[in-house]
């Protein structure tokens, strides 16, 4: 895959339920602590190395941000690092929280 794909929150949720992909959240620490998808890994410059050590390049990665814009750059970056399949989640955390309020965790 040379280009990331966009995915809606319903499809992203299904991929998580079926363990077909991992979810990363690239928002700032304060926003992440105020609420994030239950299964999200908080991906930052400081946690990138750990994420890459723990997730093979053939593991599909879904990137979540605030509204679905910043995630596109991060998705492209992960492709450039060697990940085979990367998705940017349309609508970001705001859409996730609206559609799946019961699947939001709080705290870091």
Curated annotation (Swiss-Prot):
Belongs to the GlpE family. Gene3D superfamilies: Rhodanese-like domain. One of its GO terms (molecular function) is thiosulfate-cyanide sulfurtransferase activity. It is an enzyme of class 2 (transferase). The keyword Cell inner membrane does not apply. It is found in: Cytoplasm. This is Thiosulfate sulfurtransferase GlpE. It comes from the Bacteria. GO terms for biological process: glycerol metabolic process. Residues 17-105 form the Rhodanese domain. The lineage of its organism: Bacteria, Pseudomonadati, Pseudomonadota, Gammaproteobacteria, Enterobacterales. The keyword Cytoplasm applies. Transferase that catalyzes the transfer of sulfur from thiosulfate to thiophilic acceptors such as cyanide or dithiols. May function in a CysM-independent thiosulfate assimilation pathway by catalyzing the conversion of thiosulfate to sulfite, which can then be used for L-cysteine biosynthesis. Keywords: Cytoplasm, Transferase. Its EC number is 2.8.1.1. One of its GO terms (cellular component) is cytoplasm. InterPro entries: GlpE_sulfurtransferase (IPR050229), Rhodanese-like_dom (IPR001763), Rhodanese-like_dom_sf (IPR036873), Thiosulf_sulfurTrfase (IPR023695).
């Amino acid at each position: 895959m040379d280009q990331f794909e966009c995915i809606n929150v319903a499809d992203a949720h299904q991929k998580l339920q079926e363990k077909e992909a991992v979810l990363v959240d690239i928002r700032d620490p304060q926003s992440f602590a105020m609420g994030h998808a239950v299964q999200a890994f908080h991906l930052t410059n400081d946690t990138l190395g750990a994420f890459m050590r723990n997730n093979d390049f053939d593991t599909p990665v879904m990137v979540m941000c605030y509204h679905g814009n910043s995630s596109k750059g991060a998705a492209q970056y992960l492709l450039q690092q060697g990940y085979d399949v990367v998705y940017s989640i349309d609508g970001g955390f705001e859409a996730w929280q609206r559609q799946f309020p019961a699947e939001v965790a709080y705290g870091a």
